Amino acid sequence: MSEKKEIATFAGGCFWCMVKPFDEQPGIEKVVSGYTGGHTENPTYEEVCSETTGHREAVQITFQPDIYPYEKLVELFWQQIDPTDAGGQFADRGSSYRAAIYYHNDEQKQIAEASKKQLEESGIFKKPIVTDILKAEPFYEAEGYHQHFYKKNPDHYGRYRVGSGRQGFLDEHWRDR
């Protein structure tokens, strides 16, 4: 078996909720919370939350495509977000919480665009799919206390995932699929 590794980057609102779903899959080497898409080098959490850096909260995933292909990562990404929300995700509002797929090569771009089209045509959502598909930009790792938040603070993570409205939305749209 090949040890080929690739990188995938997804912005899906608060990065706390974006790590666990990917972390649990086979062939995923690591999932890092961070910031991408902005104009400030090495931004802090406070700077990103101030909406002045242009960054989005995101996760960067190192994966083995022979075990867990990029197509499956994109499919799992869609199942973690509200792709019809251009103003943020769930309780988190603002440009730093907007969803996006950041592609690292032409193949990823084509897969992401085809997947978005398929989702649009599926009828799962009544509103248009507005999630951006963008060329990957520099990714800056978030502060240590944000990394694997679901493991370090399981109770807080669980309350946040439900209280933000994320879990209810995902259950409503994906439970039976």
UniProtKB/Swiss-Prot annotation:
InterPro entries: Met_Sox_Rdtase_MsrA_dom, Met_Sox_Rdtase_MsrA_sf. The keyword Cell membrane does not apply. Its EC number is 1.8.4.11. It is an enzyme of class 1 (oxidoreductase). The keyword Oxidoreductase applies. The active site is at residue 14. It catalyses: L-methionyl-[protein] + [thioredoxin]-disulfide + H2O = L-methionyl-(S)-S-oxide-[protein] + [thioredoxin]-dithiol; [thioredoxin]-disulfide + L-methionine + H2O = L-methionine (S)-S-oxide + [thioredoxin]-dithiol. It comes from the Bacteria. PANTHER family: PEPTIDE METHIONINE SULFOXIDE REDUCTASE, PEPTIDE METHIONINE SULFOXIDE REDUCTASE MSRA 2. Belongs to the MsrA Met sulfoxide reductase family. HAMAP family: MsrA. This is Peptide methionine sulfoxide reductase MsrA. The gene is msrA.
